[in-house]
Amino acid sequence: PYRRQRQMCIRDRYYVIAPVILITTFVISMFLFIYTLLRRWFKAGRTASVAVGTVLTFAALQFTYKPSDSFYWYNGAIYYTFFFSLMLFLFTSVITIIKSENTAARVICSVLSMPLAFMIGGGNYATALFTSIILVLLTAWQIKHKDKSFIILAVITVLSLVSLGISVMAPGNAIRQASVGAGPGVLKALVYSFAYGAYNIADSTTFPVAVMWIALLPVFYRIAVSSGLKFRFPAAAIIFFYCVYCAQGTPVFYAQGIHMPYRMMNIIYFAYYGFMTISLIYLSLIHI
């Protein structure tokens, strides 16, 4: 008994490492993703990219729904928050592959992206599905624009989809599904996803967060101007972004109905900041 108690004491003593790992990876990945998105995709200035990345990362960390489930509960958070952070690292690498003119940077990011995509595909279904959807869309975009980077993107996408497929077909899923009962079906899961997406956006836009977005609007407008991008169908694009955003909730609603754990709610909340940033910049482009 003494030996077992001693082992538990040692384990608890080192448990403090968990939030350090989870918070550090989240902060770094969130900042790098926002910075790279603005700097490379929208051609924003370095100062604006750093400022927006810092503000959004701080807000996402500060106003997390349930910090205990995202950063302090290792067993739950490592499978959700940590994998979400890996997804952001992957998207940062993919943007670099598409937009960077530095061959070495593109090669390094390509090498890093392949194992990352395979690993994420085998993680929680929300992040795995969302990642695969984004990768498919980016690959299609590159094919349409006849960019040679579509080849490596296609490889990364296939790795993500194969990993997700293996995860879905794993025998343990049937056992787990039997223990929670039958889900509501595909149609209801989609309805729940769209409803929760709207609720999540409204609930996440608290007064301080709304003030933050208003304060960032002039910055987003300048970024939109510097990007040189133009879009002809703003309403359709925002609806499309919203559909992709809502897809995160579909796996859990399909499997468990309307019961969503906080750790799942947290990663959808984190994605809210990326969705709002892209949408607000896009809306700024309408008048240019």
Predicted regions: what is each one?
Residues 29-33, 206-232:
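Hydrophobic, aromatic-rich transmembrane alpha-helices
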Residues 130-160:
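Perimembrane helix-loop-helix junctions
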Residues 107-136:
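Membrane-interface alpha helices of multi-pass inner-membrane proteins
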Residues 21-47, 51, 89:
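Transmembrane-helix motifs of polytopic, lipid-linked glycan transferases
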Residues 48-95, 124, 246-281:
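Membrane-interface micro-motifs in multi-pass membrane enzymes
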Residues 1-6, 10, 286-287:
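Single conserved hydrophobic/aromatic residue that forms the stacking wall/gate
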Residues 52-59, 153-160, 228-254:
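Transmembrane alpha-helix segments characteristic
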Residues 96-118, 148, 154-155:
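Short hydrophobic alpha-helices at membrane interfaces in multi-pass membrane enzymes
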